Regions:
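Core beta-strand-centered patch of the WYL/Sm-like small regulatory domain
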Residues: 73-181, 262
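A generic structural signal for beta-strand entry/edge sites
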Residues: 35, 123-125, 207-212
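Short, surface-exposed beta-strand/loop "edge" segments at domain boundaries and coil↔beta transitions
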Residues: 46-47, 110-111, 135-141, 190-193, ...
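Short Lys/Arg-rich basic patches
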Residues: 1, 20-45
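Extended, charge-enriched helical/coil interaction regions that scaffold DNA-processing
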Residues: 39-43, 48-58
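Polybasic (Lys/Arg-rich)
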Residues: 172-262
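Short, basic alpha-helical nucleic acid-contact segments in DNA-binding proteins
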Residues: 17-22, 71-74
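Short amphipathic alpha-helical segments
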Residues: 5-16, 57-69
Length: 262
């Protein structure tokens, strides 16, 4: 699976995408690689033979290899655009028309004001930044995880243009802009901080071993939970309490196991 799609789904999408496009020619020194097998859908099956004839394809395996290698040689966000081309086009149409859209995301239907699509530098994934009227706040939704899109005739509302512009300039998937988290590190905590780069929040300022980050609570839970006793969350209070509750629940799990083993 890739982008939560089965290989057969990916194969059908990229075949259709590259029907009228030039392919990179790939020559392999040996053919001992993994064999990929899947069935073409009815629409692609109908045009497949014509495509082989029109492109003067003599060896089908070579043709498919060129398709997959041409696709794989794209950057990750570009591969995402290929696989979810319909989503990108529908969002771009809504932005051009200036209309709200309804989306199905993680099984829930939401009415949103779409503002822009932005690629996350840390993930190379595309996000739709919007105002969600279901949740009454600003959200980032992964374009690849939007299940359905419906057009509406309602015009997009610009809730806070200054904030939207700042998020665009300082984009990150967790919407950390203007959110602050203050953390006290032990010496070993600082050593680990230097090593753990994935999802590391933006550093702002430090006072001895107390660091302040531009970071929202969700990102803080993902990043700092792995430090255990090597850090102490000082601010904000709600994050401090949430992490404390999570650690207490974890401790209960281990204590219950110990009691059963006695």
């Amino acid at each position: 699976e890739y982008f939560k799609l089965q290989i057969g789904k990916i194969g059908n999408i990229i075949f259709n995408y590259y029907i009228d496009k030039n392919l990179n020619k790939v020559e392999l020194e040996d053919s001992s690689g993994e064999v990929i097998q899947f069935n073409l859908n009815k629409s692609n099956e109908e045009i497949y033979l014509d495509t082989l004839i029109r492109n003067k394809i003599e060896i089908e395996a070579e043709y498919w290899r060129n398709i997959f290698f041409t696709y794989i040689n794209n950057l990750r966000y570009k591969r995402e655009e290929i696989l979810f081309e319909k989503n990108f086009k529908n969002i771009e149409k809504a932005l051009k028309d200036g209309n709200k859209i309804k989306i199905k995301y993680h099984n829930y239907i939401r009415l949103i004001n779409p503002y822009f699509i932005k690629v996350s530098d840390s993930e190379s994934r595309s996000y739709l930044f919007c105002y969600c009227e279901k949740n009454k706040d600003y959200r980032n939704y992964r374009v690849s995880e939007i299940e359905e899109i419906w057009f509406t005739n309602e015009k997009i509302e610009i809730k806070d243009k200054k904030y939207i512009d700042e998020v665009y300039k300082n984009f990150d998937p967790f919407l950390s802009y203007k959110n602050r988290v203050k953390v006290r590190f032990t010496e070993k905590g600082l050593e680990l901080y230097e090593k753990v780069l994935i999802n590391r929040p933006k550093f702002l300022v430090k006072d001895n071993n107390i660091y302040t980050f531009e970071c929202d609570n969700k990102l803080a839970m993902i990043y700092f939970a792995q430090f255990f006793s090597l850090i102490e969350i000082l601010e904000p209070q709600e994050l401090r309490e949430k992490l404390q509750n999570e650690l207490e629940n974890t401790l209960k799990i281990y204590k219950n196991r110990e009691d059963k083993d006695v």
